[in-house]
Amino acid sequence: MTVSVDTLSAFVEVAKHLSVSGAGKALGLPKSAISKRVASLEASVETTLFSRSTRKIALTSAGELYLDFAQRTVLQAATAIENVKDLHANTSGGLSGKIRLTAPVSWGQQVLARHLPAFVTLHPQLEIELQLSDRTMDLAYERIDLALRWSSSPLHGLPGLSSEQIASVDWIYVAAPDYLARAGTPVLPQALADHSCMCYWQENADDAWVMLNNRAAEPICVRVSSRFHANNPETVCLATIAGCGIALLPGYACTQALKSRKLVRVLRDWTPVTKFGTHITAVATPERMRMARVRALVAYLRAQAA
C-alpha cells in the first residue's frame, strides 16, 4: 500500500506533540482525521507506532525508527513544493511564500527586529514566521527554514547543513563611571578578582573570564566573583548602569548606554573569548538554503551587517 505524504505528516506531528489534538491543530484537521491517518499508516507498516493509554501517547521503538524516514520524506516533499513556488516567483518577478526563521532572543530583539520590517515591506507577498529562542532547534523536525545562531567562527560547519556568516559581534567589558569612582578602574585582567562582576549567563556558563591581548601569546583566564547572573544581556546592562559592577556584554546590548556615558569601557586592550562566539551564522539544510526567498533573506541580512 502506498503511503501518502499527508499520512506521514500526521504521524510526524503526532510524534512532535505527543498528542492527536495537538497534531490536528498544527495541520488544521479534526482529531478524527489525524487518528484515521495514523491508523492507516500502522496498518500499512504492519506494526504499532504509538503506545497509547488514557492519559498519554508515546512512540514505540518501531515508531522511533520510522520517524526519521517520515521526517525526511515530509521535508523533501515540502521542499519540492517550495522550489516550484520559487521557480514561479522568479519567473513572475517576486518572492512569495513563508520563511520560518529562528534567532537568539537577545540578538533577535536588539538587531534582527530592526532589519526584518524593511525586508517584509520590500517583498509584500512574503511571510516571515520568527521564533526567538536560545535553544538549538532541530531544523528538519521543527520545520525551520533558516536558523540564525551564535558561532565561534565565520564558517560554522555542521554535518548535513549549509552555513553562511551574517554578522560579527563584539564583546566588551563595561562599567558605570560611579562604580569605577568607588572601586577603581582595572588596568590588568587580574584586577577583576577584586571587583564585583556580572555575567550574561546561559547554560554551561561559569565565572571564568577568558581573554586575549595582542601582546600575549596565550589567552589568560581570570576567576571572577559574580554577584549577578541573568540570561538576558539587557538586564545585565541595566544592573551595570545601576553601579552593580563590571559586566561582559555584547556591544549591541549597551550601545546607547555607551553613547550617553552611562557606561564606559574598561580593559579595552583585551578581547573577551566567550562561549557564545563572536559571529551570527545562518544555518539551513542545503535544500532550504537554495530556496530563492531564503537566499534573498540571507543576502539582505549580510548587507545590513556590512
Where are these regions (language model features)?
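C-terminal regulatory
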Residues: Y141, L155-T281
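Short helix-loop hinge/linker segments at domain boundaries
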Residues: T54-I57, E64, L75-R100
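A short LG(V/I)-centered, amphipathic sequence patch enriched
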Residues: E42-L59
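Short helix-boundary/capping micro-motifs
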Residues: V12-G28
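Central regulatory/effector-binding core of bacterial HTH transcription factors
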Residues: S96-S162
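A late-sequence structural motif
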Residues: R268-A306
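Conserved amphipathic alpha-helical core elements
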Residues: L41-E42, L263
